[in-house]
């Protein structure tokens, strides 16, 4: 979802890959994007690779466990350009309450209209991220500033 929002709202290129991905876009995510006027029907999820990480300026993940897995699988050197999508602007003090995790809509059976409303904050977030990447707005806080805290999170939890 974030890639399509970024490309649509910011008119900028983005890549999309995940640590755990299926063969097609999740139907709920696709319906949410369609409700926002974005066609993602041709999207095919890709698995993240070290080569892809090396090609990117920034990597945004959906939760602390994914950050932990990213550096565990591909190296701590990525911590300087890895961020939590939910809040890439503050340094977390704790991950105990799950506040830095984006809940995947694929596990939510509510109607699309409710999910569209719940995930509306993502539209604003991608615009904020683009501003930060362009040197405007709030500065991004990379994983390198809280790497030890992140490594305390179970990398296999979601």
Give each language-model segment a name.
Residues 1-56, 131-140, 155:
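Conserved active-site segments centered on acidic
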Residues 58, 70-158:
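Phosphate-binding/catalytic loops
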Residues 61-62:
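Short beta-strand scaffold positions
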Residues 66-68:
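Alpha-helix capping/helix-boundary segments
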């Amino acid at each position: 979802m974030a890639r399509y929002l970024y490309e649509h709202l910011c008119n900028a290129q983005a890549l999309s890959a995940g640590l755990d991905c299926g063969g097609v876009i999740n139907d709920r995510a696709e319906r949410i994007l369609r409700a926002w006027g974005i066609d993602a029907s041709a999207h095919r999820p890709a698995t993240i690779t070290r080569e892809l990480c090396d090609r990117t300026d920034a990597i945004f993940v959906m939760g602390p466990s994914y950050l932990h897995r990213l550096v565990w699988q591909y190296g701590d050197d990525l911590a300087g350009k890895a961020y939590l999508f939910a809040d890439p602007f503050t340094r977390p003090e704790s991950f105990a309450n799950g506040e830095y995790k984006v809940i995947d809509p694929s596990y939510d059976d509510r109607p699309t209209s409710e999910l569209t409303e719940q995930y509306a904050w993502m539209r604003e977030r991608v615009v904020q991220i683009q501003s930060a990447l362009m040197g405007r707005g709030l500065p991004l806080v990379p994983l390198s500033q809280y790497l030890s805290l992140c490594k305390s999170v179970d990398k296999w939890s979601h």
